[in-house]
Amino acid sequence: MRVLFAAAECAPMVKVGGMGDVVGSLPPALAKLDHDVRLIMPGYGKLWSLLDIPTDPIWRGQTMGNEFAIYETSHPSNGLPLYLVGHPVFDPERIYGGEDEDWRFTFFASATTEFAWNVWKPQVLHCHDWHTGMIPVWMHQDPEVSTVFTIHNLKYQGPWRWKLDRMTWCPWYMQGDHTMAAALLYADRVNAVSPTYAREICTSEYGESLDGLLNYISGKLRGILNGIDLQDWDPANDKSLPATFSADDLSGRAVNKQALQQRMGLEVNPDTYLLGMVSRLVDQKGVDLLLQVTERLLAYTDSQIVVLGTGERGLESSLWQLAIQNPGRFSVFLTYDDDLARLIYGGSDAFLMPSRFEPCGISQLLAMRYGSVPVVRKVGGLVDTVPSYDPIHKTGTGFCFDRFEPVDFYTALVRSWEAFRHRDCWRELQQRAMTQNYSWDRSALDYDQMYRDVCGLKEPSPDAAVVEQFSLGQGSDPSRQGQDSNAKKRTRRKKKGND
């Protein structure tokens, strides 16, 4: 099946959030299932120094009163075809922000639509977040192309109707209130990045004012869990770590813990409970909860805390003040450093994710992969990926709390600290977390089924037997599977959708 991914990010070249990881890692997993997968993204200025891009474009087009060029290259990690939309508006190295952000991404969506109509027509055009939200609207008139829209974060919804009226030729009645709403209305399938988040966004608490619309389209909405690249994130072969290790031999973690304590200016002590956090420092991630419980936690336990990330100025300043007030026990690094992030995953005893909401979350998967036990709030994808630790039955992979309240978070932290003191049980907990399977191969099977469903192809993938070891059901919402709110359109396509 021909599948075109359209997104504003793609790891490792352009990555701001989890969407970049998905767009960089899911396509090669789908290619293993015999899909012809290609990617298209804005031609940001930085890409010309990172990729081998031919001087001459493969095609030139015009849309929204502007000319653009399409350049073809390949993804540096997986070799899949990668198309770049060339236009001066993408020349600056910034990805998001700026007064022209709405116009830039609406233009990218329009150029992608022209590319799909004139250069390489996919059977499935897979769009990601509001930046590509107008593509399902424009492609809806083409019965040969099915559209899938993935919600990575419902909070970011794109330009409102009055802006779209001025930027595009699209009539008002096809736009919804904003770009996100338009995509939800016109995409043939919509998926969130975890089953729990797919259910949560249909409620007023998490629906970001779109819960009514999401309930209306619930027949085509489902949740598919994100995965991680098990080869890229492998503690047994990670060259950035001072010492490698595996679930069978955790001895290297002690070396990494010492290196992490030294690098972050903490007191070096192998018996101290070391907590790590790698995150955008924003309201969503629960940084305010951490600020409220840190002083008490440090006063009553022998814990240390390290934080890596950037974000809101106020939160950065508060974390910096905590570090000044608690030298040797609390350290913050206000930047993003991939090697340091890996050291935190591979050297910390536990990993903090007290999120206000969490569509899926990648960090908890990486933490478990590296033996750092997650302490998380029961929300979104954290519910689907971190079962609560039960010392009696020896099940679970982390410590969970329900309410977004300091007392709940503090209680979970103390429970984890007490468990850490029982080293044999803690080692078993680490090993159980490290052996969880959250590979993209498993998630790809669910996407494969969704593609086939939307195109009217019910037979399994030719190579599905190769990956039968992965559970088809886990990572998706069974109640959503096979539902179709647009049966007539699917019937028209059925005779056209061939591999």
From Swiss-Prot:
Gene3D superfamilies: Glycogen Phosphorylase B. Pathway: Glycan biosynthesis; glycogen biosynthesis. Residues 471-485 have a biased composition (Polar residues). Pfam families: Glyco_transf_5 (PF08323), Glycos_transf_1 (PF00534). Its EC number is 2.4.1.21. Residues 471-499 are annotated as: Disordered. ADP-alpha-D-glucose binds at K15. This is Glycogen synthase. It comes from Prochlorococcus marinus (strain MIT 9303).
